[in-house]
Amino acid sequence: MQALMEMQIGASEVVQVLDTGCAVLPPESPLPMPEQSLRKGRLHVPRQRTAPLGIGLRRFYLIGGTMSMSLIATWVMLAVMWPGGINVLEGCLLVLFMFLFAWVTMSFASALAGFFCMVFGGGRKLGIDPQMPLPDLHTYTALLVPTYQEDPCRLLAGLQAIYESLSETGQLEHFEFFVLSDSRREEFGLAEEREYAALCERLGAHGRIFYRRRADNTGRKAGNIADWVRRFGGAYQQMLILDADSVMTGDTVVRLVAAMESNPDVGLIQSLPVVVGGRTLFARMQQFGACVYGPIIAYGVAWWHGAESNYWGHNAVIRTKAFADHAGLPALPGRKPFGGHVLSHDFVEAALIRRGGWATHMVPYLQGSYEEGPPTLTDLLIRDRRWCQGNLQHAKIVTAAGLHWISRMHMLIGIGHYFTAPMWGLLMLVGIAIPLVGDGIDLTAGMHFSPAHYWHGRTDGDVLWIFTFTMFVLLAPKLLAYFALLFKPYERRACGGALRVLLSILLESILAALMAPIVMYLQSRGVFEVLAGKDSGWDAQQRDDGKLSWSVLLRSYGGLSVLGVLIGALAYTVSPPLAMWMSPVVLGMAFSVPVVALTSHRLVGAVLRRWGIFLIPEETAPSKVLIRVAELRRARQP
C-alpha cells in the first residue's frame, strides 16, 4: 500500500484519483456515453461493407435447411403416430419433438458449414492473416481487466504475461492497461493494491498500467466498463476487454487492433478463446470439447453471422467511440429478475453497436486467445444460473426498435437454449404418460425394445428411422469435428493422435450423456426460479480447483438422485421397454452424486492426462505466453 502511495510518477502524465482505496489513473479524457432507448431507434447501414458475399444465401441455407429437415422428421413422426388417431398427450409429444428436433438440426446445419470452412480454408476476413508479418499500429488501445473479488496474484500474472508479450512485438507504446476493480470486500481491495504496486515495480510500468476500485459498483461489469468509457475513453481509439482469467498473445492483440484500424466501419471483433488450465476431470473434458468441437461451431456461426456477429463479453476488441455512442445500457423497467440492470450485457451491446451502423465480426481462425473454464460441474451450474437469468431477461429487449434481425436471432437462441431444458423434461414425462392412458397397452409385456410397442399398428422401421436420424443429427457435429482434426496434422498429433482423440471423444460423449440429465434438471429449475421472480445475485467465480465435500454433494444432488430412482421405477412399472429407452436419463439422475464427485477430482484428470486422454495442444505444446503465466503464478504462490 505504501509503495503504491509513494510511486514517483510525473504529474503531467498521471494523477491519483480517489475512488475507494488508492487509485492510480491517467488524466481523465471524458467520452459521452448516453443511455440508449429500446423504444426508439432505427437500423443504420442495413448492409455492411465487410459483410461476406452471398450472406443472404448462407442464412437461407441455415434457416431453410433447418426447417426442411425438421418438417420431414415431424411428418414421419406424425405418420408413425397417426393410425388410430392422436390424443392430447401424443399431440404434445409431437409439438415438443418438432421444436427440439429443429433446435438440434440448426446446430447440425451450422456445424456442417463450419466443417467446410475449416477443411477448405474459408471464413477468413477483415484482412487478418496470421501468416503475414505483424502490421504496424498507429492508434492507442486500452486493455481493460474488470475484476470482482478475484485472486489478484492469478489476475496480474495473466496481465504481466500479456504485457511482456506485447513488449516483444515492439509495439507496447500503443497500449495502456487498466485494472478495473469492483471488489467490495476490503481485504480484496488491499491485496489488489499491494499486488498492483509490486507488478508496476517489477515491470517498470508506472504510467502504463493503472488501477482503480469503484466506490459504487452499480451495473456490475457493464457498469464498470461504462464508468471507464465515460471518464477515460476519449484518449483511446480501441479498448480490448479481458476477463480475470483471460490471456492473449501480443501477436494476436496487435492483429486484432490492426484489423480495427484498417476497417473503419467495424465496431467489434470477437476472437475465439481456447479454454486452458483445467486439471479436474470435468475441466479437462470441457477444454477438450472446446478445443475439438469449438472451432467447427465457431467457424459455422461466423460463416452465417457475417457482419452481425455476437459478443461474448471478453477477448474482443471494440471501437471505443462506437461503444460509447451506441452501447449505453438502460435499466429495464420492473423488478428483478426481469427488471433492473442488464445481466447478459454482451449480447445487447453487440446488438446496439450493430444498430448504430457498425459491423460486428468474429474471427475464429486467429489463435493466441485463451480463457479458463470452471473446475467442476457445480461451478458451471452456478455460473449458468446467472446466464439463465440474463438470457431470459432478453425477452424484454428482443423487440427493441431498430435491431438487426440477426441480433434478435442471437437473443432468441439464447432464450431458447434455456427453455429446451424443461422441454426435454416434458418430453420425458409425456413419454411416461402415454402408455398409462393408451388403449390396450400391456404393462406386463416382456422386454420388447422397440418404441413402436407404445402404439398399435406402427412399424418398427419408421420409428427406427426417426431414432437413427435424430441420433445422427445430434452426434454429427462431433464426428465432423473429428474428421476436420484429421486434416490438421499438427493439432491431431498435439491432441495425442487420431486414436486417442477418438477415445477421448467417446469418453467425453459418455460423460456428457451422464451429466446431461443433471444439467437439464438444474437448468429447468433455474428457468422456473426466474419466472417465479428469484434473482441470481452476484458472487465471485470459482477458478481454482475447489474440492466438493460429500455433504455438499448430497445437499446439492441427493434430491435429484432420489428423483431419478423414482422416475426409473415408475417407467419400469408402466412399461419395461419405456424404462430401457429412458435409461440414459434415469442413470444420469440416479448417479448424479458419484458422477459429479468423480468429474470434480483432480487425480482422475491427472491419470487421464498421463494416458493421453483429453489432451489439447496447449498442454502438449503450450505457447510462450501460457508458459509465462504458469511460471508467474507458481512464483507468487505463498
From Swiss-Prot:
<keyword id="KW-1003">Cell membrane</keyword>
<keyword id="KW-0328">Glycosyltransferase</keyword>
<dbReference type="InterPro" id="IPR001173">
    <property type="entry name" value="Glyco_trans_2-like"/>
</dbReference>
<keyword id="KW-0808">Transferase</keyword>
<comment type="similarity">
    <text>Belongs to the glycosyltransferase 2 family. OpgH subfamily.</text>
</comment>
<feature type="transmembrane region" description="Helical">
    <location>
        <begin position="94"/>
        <end position="116"/>
    </location>
</feature>
<dbReference type="Pfam" id="PF13632">
    <property type="entry name" value="Glyco_trans_2_3"/>
</dbReference>
<feature type="transmembrane region" description="Helical">
    <location>
        <begin position="464"/>
        <end position="486"/>
    </location>
</feature>
<dbReference type="InterPro" id="IPR029044">
    <property type="entry name" value="Nucleotide-diphossugar_trans"/>
</dbReference>
<keyword id="KW-1133">Transmembrane helix</keyword>
<comment type="pathway">
    <text>Glycan metabolism; osmoregulated periplasmic glucan (OPG) biosynthesis.</text>
</comment>
<keyword id="KW-0997">Cell inner membrane</keyword>
<feature type="transmembrane region" description="Helical">
    <location>
        <begin position="415"/>
        <end position="437"/>
    </location>
</feature>
<keyword id="KW-0472">Membrane</keyword>
<feature type="transmembrane region" description="Helical">
    <location>
        <begin position="578"/>
        <end position="600"/>
    </location>
</feature>
<dbReference type="GO" id="GO:0005886">
    <property type="term" value="C:plasma membrane"/>
</dbReference>
<keyword id="KW-0812">Transmembrane</keyword>
<feature type="transmembrane region" description="Helical">
    <location>
        <begin position="57"/>
        <end position="79"/>
    </location>
</feature>
<dbReference type="InterPro" id="IPR023725">
    <property type="entry name" value="Glucans_biosynth_gluTrFase_H"/>
</dbReference>
<dbReference type="GO" id="GO:0016758">
    <property type="term" value="F:hexosyltransferase activity"/>
</dbReference>
<protein>
    <recommendedName>
        <fullName>Glucans biosynthesis glucosyltransferase H</fullName>
        <ecNumber>2.4.1.-</ecNumber>
    </recommendedName>
</protein>
<comment type="function">
    <text>Involved in the biosynthesis of osmoregulated periplasmic glucans (OPGs).</text>
</comment>
<feature type="transmembrane region" description="Helical">
    <location>
        <begin position="499"/>
        <end position="521"/>
    </location>
</feature>
<dbReference type="InterPro" id="IPR050321">
    <property type="entry name" value="Glycosyltr_2/OpgH_subfam"/>
</dbReference>
<dbReference type="GO" id="GO:0009250">
    <property type="term" value="P:glucan biosynthetic process"/>
</dbReference>
